[in-house]
Swiss-Prot record:
Gene Ontology terms: biological process: cell differentiation; flower development; vegetative to reproductive phase transition of meristem
Region Disordered: start-end pairs: 356-384
Top-rank lineage group of the source organism: Eukaryota
Other comments on record: In cv. Columbia and cv. Landsberg erecta, either FRL1 or FRL2, but not both, is functional and required for FRI-mediated up-regulation of FLC.
Source organism: Arabidopsis thaliana
Mutant lacking the gene: phenotype: No effect on flowering time, due to a partial redundancy with FRL1. Frl1 and frl2 double mutants flower earlier than frl1 single mutant.
Main function: Inactive FRIGIDA-like 2 protein.
Gene: FRL2
Entry protein name: Inactive FRIGIDA-like protein 2
Ranges in coiled-coil conformation: 3-35, 306-361
Pfam families per record: Frigida
Tissue: Expressed at low levels throughout the plant, with slightly higher expression in developing seeds and the highest expression in pollen.
Source taxonomy: Eukaryota, Viridiplantae, Streptophyta, Embryophyta, Tracheophyta
Amino acid sequence: MTAAESIAASINQIDEKKQKLKKAFDDLQAHRSLLSPSFNLSWSEIDSHFSSLQSSLFNRLQSAVTSSNSGNIETPTAVTTETPVLWPELRKFCEKNDGKGLGNYMIENSRKRLSINEELPNAIRCSENPAPLVLDAIEGSYHCSSPSSSSSARAIDVKRIFVLLLEALIEINANLTNDLRERARTIAYDWKPNIGNKPSEALGFLHLVAAFELGSLFSTEEICDYIFLISKYKQATTICKKIGLDRNRIGVLVQKFLDTGRLLVAIRFIYENEMVGEFEPVSILKTSLKNSREAAKRVCAEGNYSLKVQNEATDKELSALRAVIKVVKEKNIESEFMEEKLEECVKELEDQKAQRKRATKFNSPANPQQPQEQKVDNKRPRVANGSSMEYNLTIPPLRPQQQPPLLPTPSQILQVNPYGLLSSILPGVAVPYGNPRALFGSVPAPASRPVFYVQQTGYGMPPPQYRPPYYPQ
C-alpha cells in the first residue's frame, strides 16, 4: 500500500471514529448536571469541526497527489498513478448507469455523506447519461423520504442525499431532454405538498427545480417564499442564480431579510449578488452588532442575571460578534470598524465568562461553608472594570443594602439630667461631659454635637458588628 492509499484509508475511518466520539459525548451529556455551567458545547459544533478537518485533509491529499503526478510526468509510475478513491463503489454504480443502486448505496452511507460528496461529481461524470442516473436514484428512493415513512431521521437523510445528487448534476451541467424534464416535473409536483414550513424539504425541492430548469412551472412568489425558508443554507444564493431570479426579486428578498431581522443573511445575498450599491452593508453589520448587544442585555434581565442566563447571553453575543468579524475580514472592510474594536470585544466577553466560571468554582458546594459570623468580614471578589466599549454585558453591580442604624439617634441616646449633665438612656454606657459649662453653669449643656463613646471604636478596632467572635465585646 502506497503512502497516499494509506492516508486515504485513514481519512475514510474518520466517520467511523466520529460515531464512537458521538457515543462518548452522549454518555457525557447524561451527567450534564455534574459539569460546569459554562460547558455548552453541542455535538453539531464538534461534528462540524471534524467534518471540516476531514474535507481539508482530503483536498490537501488530492492536491499533493496531483502535484506529484505533474512533477514526475516522465516516469511511467507517475503517469499511471491516480488520485486515491475513497468510494470506488460510486463509480461502479455510475459506470453501470444503476441509479437505483447508487441512491440506495448513498442512503446506507448517509452518515459519511461529506466524504462521499467530494467524489460524487467525478463519479457521475463516469456515467454516459448523468441526468437519467440522478432521476433514477431519486425515483428509486423517494418513498423513503415521504412523511409517512417509519423514521423521520431516515427521511431527512434521504433528502440530504437527494441534494448531494442534484448539486453534483448542477455542477457538471448535464444535457437535459424534454422527457427528463417531464419526469422531473412529476417528482416536483409530488414533492411540493410536503414542503410546508420544513426547510429541508424546500431545499431539496429547489435543487430539483434548479437542476432540471423547472422554474417557469411555478410562480415567482412561491420560489421566493421557498428561498426565504432555506435562507440559512449556504446554497440559497446559488439556487437564486441557477433558477434565474431577476435582480428586482432578489432585492425584495434582501429587504424582507432586513425587515425580519436576518441581517447576516441579507449581507450574504447583497455581496454574492453584487448589490452593495442598493444597500449599505457596513450600516447593516453595525446594526447587527447593536441588536446582538441589546438582545444579550434583555436575556440577562429577563433571567434575573442568573449565572446560566449570563453564560447563554455571552455565548450568543460572541457568536454574533464572530460572524460579523468573519464578514469584515472576507470583504476587507476592517477600516470601517476601527472604533468598534471587535477583537477586543471578543476577548473581553471571553474574560467575563472565565471570571464567572472561577467564581462558580470558588462558591461551589465542594468548598466548606464558612460560619455566618466570618462571612461578613470577607471582601467581595473584585469585578473587572468596565471599559468604554459598548459590547460588555451591562450587569448592575451589587449594591449593599442600606442597614438600619445599630444605635438610636443622638437625641434619643442622650438626656439632660436636673444638674445640667448629659446622661445616656443606654444601660452601662458612660457619657463624658458634653460641655464645660455643664458642671458650673445653670444653662443646660447643648446636645448639638454630643460626644458618645459607643460610636467610637478606638485604636483602629473595627466596629462591633464587624468583629469576629474571637474579639471580646
